Amino acid sequence: MELHIIFLILGGLLIVLLAGFSIYSARREKSRIFSNTFTTRQPATPIKNIVTDVPATLDPLQYGQNPVPTENESESETGHSVQIQQEVENSLREIKINLPVQETAEYTQTPLNTPIYHNQPAQPTFLQTAPPIEPLTIPTVEPIQPETTSVLEQSLEELERQAAERELDLYSDASVRIELAKNSIQTPIEEVAQPESTVITQNNIITLYVVAPEGQQFDGHYVVQSLEALGFQFGEYQIYHRHQHLGNNDTPVIFSVANMMQPGIFDLNNLDSYATVGLVLFMHLPSEGSDLVNLKLMLKAAESLAEALGGFILNEQRELFNETDRQAYFARVS
């Protein structure tokens, strides 16, 4: 316990000594700073009254001193101040500001909205005048006379009539095209006497049409490829025939395919430029073998061609072929 008390006393003494030393050193530093800034030492030589030319009005105030002027000094000071004021006024009158004549002229003549350049000569200004704008004249449109309208109507009617005639020529009857194809053959045909002559009528021919969509045509290469893929053979009258036995041209023809466009033939030498609006399939009655079987084969061939070429099947009246037409065709050969 005694050692503990002794250590506490020693610690307190050390703290007191440190605090006192710090206070002493702070005061000493403060006194040193103030001793360098302010001094109370009297000047070595006393300041004497020196007479200057500065008037009493311009003499700075002397703080802490209140001299008592005498009568002579006050009179001399007033006279001296009056003299100084007169000299100042005279010097002010003599002061004149002289500007060069050219510069003053520039300052007076130059407008405010233009920049002033003293060292550069005046530049000439050029005025550009726009060409006069002429008034726009709008031409007057004369109304169409009734006579001109009637001429246009007549020309339109004539064009429609010619288009209808061309369409009739394209979709001409199959029997007429077959006759034309027969007449086009230049080789002479010897007449053979037959015991019985048969007259071919419309009822003895069954016809189907495969036509392209409106405004389109079948390409010649696709037509030939499709026909040959279905077993048709190019032969007599320059058209394609379907023989009773596929691949055997010596067997009888059961039905044929012709071009709807005149003269109804297939020009294999010019397939690049060949195109047609449709094909016509026809079968003569009676045919070789069963007419019903041959008719079913022709219907199947027409459907395959329409699917391959992207066309439509029409009946003999050039209407869309439907189930009713199918039954009517079967009734004709039964």
UniProtKB/Swiss-Prot annotation:
Membrane spanning residue stretches: 3-23
Membrane topology per record: Single-pass type I membrane protein
Any matching Pfam family: ZipA_C
InterPro entries: Cell_div_ZipA, ZipA_FtsZ-bd_C, ZipA_FtsZ-bd_C_sf
One of the GO biological process terms: division septum assembly
Keywords (A to Z) from UniProt: Cell cycle, Cell division, Cell inner membrane, Cell membrane, Membrane, Transmembrane, Transmembrane helix
GO cellular component entries: cell division site; plasma membrane
Location(s) in or outside the cell: Cell inner membrane
Superkingdom: Bacteria
ATP-binding listed as a keyword: no
Periplasmic side, ranges: 1-2
Cytoplasmic side: 24-334
UniProt key word Transmembrane helix: yes
UniProt function note: Essential cell division protein that stabilizes the FtsZ protofilaments by cross-linking them and that serves as a cytoplasmic membrane anchor for the Z ring. Also required for the recruitment to the septal ring of downstream cell division proteins.
Complexes and interactors: Interacts with FtsZ via their C-terminal domains.
Similarity section: Belongs to the ZipA family.
UniProt-listed PANTHER family: CELL DIVISION PROTEIN ZIPA
Name of this chain's protein: Cell division protein ZipA
